[in-house]
Amino acid sequence: MAAIDDRTGHGASGGAFAGLPPVREVPVADVASAVRSSGRRLVVLDDDPTGTQTVAGVPVLTDWSVEDIRWALRQDTPAFYILTNTRSLDARAAGERDRDVVRALVDAARIEHQRFVVVSRSDSTLRGHFPLETDVIADTLALRAGIEVDGIVVAPAYIEGGRVTVDSVHWLRAGDTAVPVGESEFAKDATFGFVSSELRAYVEEKTFGRWRAAEVPRVTLEDLRTGGVDEVAAILASARGRRPVVCDALCDDDLRVLALAAIRVEHAGRVLLYRVGPSFVRARAGLEARASLTPAEVAAIRSAGQQPSARPLGGDAGGDGASLAEASSHGLVVVGSHVAQSTRQLAALLRHGGVEAIELDVATLLDPGQSPVAIASAADAVVAGLRSADVVVSTSREVLTGPDPTASLAIARAVSASLVDLVRKVTGRVRPGFVVAKGGITSSDVATAGLGIRRAWVRGTLLPGIVSLWEPVADATAGAAAHPPIPFVVFAGNVGDEDDLVSVVATLRGAP
């Protein structure tokens, strides 16, 4: 373990964090100007919804029809997100989805006469379908648009989440210490496990030797801070034939140097594809790191979503299909993530009190004979609870895995489908004042299948750099009569301090 400073590495106990060069400060305005001059929109294919937690004021799509993408392209923003949710899919389905999204993007951009740059945003702890996704995206760009990718920029840093890269080794911070990502619980993931913390070795591991570590160029902190844009641009420009380039970052200024270099290389005619963590998107789009939303701002967003519905509800309302939704000022918190940090945060919220707690047994949810009854019973309990309190629904904390990664992913999908069924049954009868989803797969499925969100605006975060608040676009919410827009909070499973879920719920309540 090694103690580190966010920007300089000072205070470290030697090793990779000793003697780092001083930060080269880059104003956000410089990157924003370069982005405008480039004339290219940043299109972020997000493999789960947590990638939006570093940005504000940008659209997010959960559907990728040509019309939806055209809507996003017409918004006056430097970037927008398309939630592909591919991290929850097996390899074949993930590839098919990426292919469909890129085809629709190319067609929409052609109609709107827009140029674009594609970002494959993935996990800052290195889980996900790599290199599958960048391969499929590059192939589809070549076939559909004649665009040949030269280099793949690999920059997994998530500064606010404590995921940083120094000397090509990716680290996870916990308090004032850090551990190499290959030694973390995330490296043991049942679906996306790996062993390498050094990014060049990680590329070799995941590509099964297609790119050997010695053949992978790298951008170090020395390059970023001493060489600057000129040196970094030269490294990026050297990539050909979709060669990955791995990149250090310890602070936002490092990422802004990288962004300016990338824009310069693109202006010179090179095509870069990005496989990155959340922080790079903000830097490359030229967006400011905004302060967390204030209680007053959150209250305004909540009030916009609490206008009473004037139309009848059907389907999952559970009655004759003609009853009106009952509005509640209380919120629904859905915790599907089972990683250790989510479990600690859930326990803290339950200790804090003021919530009704309902736990769903995972083994029961996986039993076709028992699951429907368990979900219906839980939905009744949630509806009753929302009349007087915020309600927390969580899955049991034991981790059930299958004999192989595909089977383990199928278990996670089945559990998530049960949570979606529950949310649909609840919101068909009661409209919560807000919904919080904890965990990547949980967040995506609750947003799309549970709440029917197709288009939304990312309004900001509830904590610095983490926990994103979406405001759905009313006329693009599927089944708007049955599911009026409800403020939706995306809370990644693997980020935040122990009391952060408590803080998020308190802010949404409007508590001091």
Language model segments and positions:
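Conserved, well-structured core segments that form the ligand-binding/active-site neighborhood
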Residues: V169-A378
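N-terminal short beta-loop-beta anion/metal-coordinating cradle
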Residues: Q53-L83, S377-V383, R387-D390, V458-A480
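Cap/lid and interdomain-hinge subdomains that line or gate substrate/regulatory clefts
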Residues: A32-D46, Q53, W71-A72, P78, ...
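Short acidic, glycine/serine/threonine-rich loops at helix termini
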Residues: T54-G57, H129-E133, R163-W171, R256-A261, ...
